[in-house]
Amino acid sequence: MSMKYLMLLFATMIIRSFADSGNAIETTSPEITNTTTDIPAIRLCGPEGDGYCLHGDCIHARDINGMYCRCSHGYTGIRCQHVVLVDYQRSEKPNTTTSYIPSPGIVLVLVGIIMCCLLSVYRFTRRTNKLPLQDMVVP
């Protein structure tokens, strides 16, 4: 993520506390009166931002020129134009059940191969034990 996005994200968390606070500092000398208003780093856009964000609040950051949206719950996008679907949130999680499906199949195939091997060895040894001993000479 870019640094500007991180700054904006942090700033939107504290926008409510600074949105309405504008501290005015007034200094007076015999000839000049100077009033300085403390402008918050992040503020609501005001009338120029009406309708900019479709489902959220429009904010203006002092350091980053431009309007940005803080989306309401359930919306996303640059202008909060996309609805976050429940199925989309579920699809982000890895599906672990499909990774276990091949395992029983592989185990069954291996057990079948082992059973065939054991059966063939059993038949071979049984056949060799039943053969008559014709070549054997009795003393």
Curated annotation (Swiss-Prot):
Top-level division of the source organism's lineage: Viruses
Gene Ontology biological-process entries: epidermal growth factor receptor signaling pathway; positive regulation of cell population proliferation; positive regulation of mitotic nuclear division
GO molecular function: epidermal growth factor receptor binding; growth factor activity
UniProt subcellular location: Secreted
Residue ranges constituting the EGF-like domain according to the UniProt record: 41-81
Stated induction or repression of this protein's expression: Expressed in the early phase of the viral replicative cycle.
Disulfide bonds: 45-58, 53-69, 71-80
Protein task: Stimulates cellular proliferation (hyperplasia)and mobility around infected cells to promote rapid and efficient spread of infection.
Name of this chain's protein: Growth factor
Lineage, opening ranks: Viruses, Varidnaviria, Bamfordvirae, Nucleocytoviricota, Pokkesviricetes
Gene responsible for this protein: OPG019
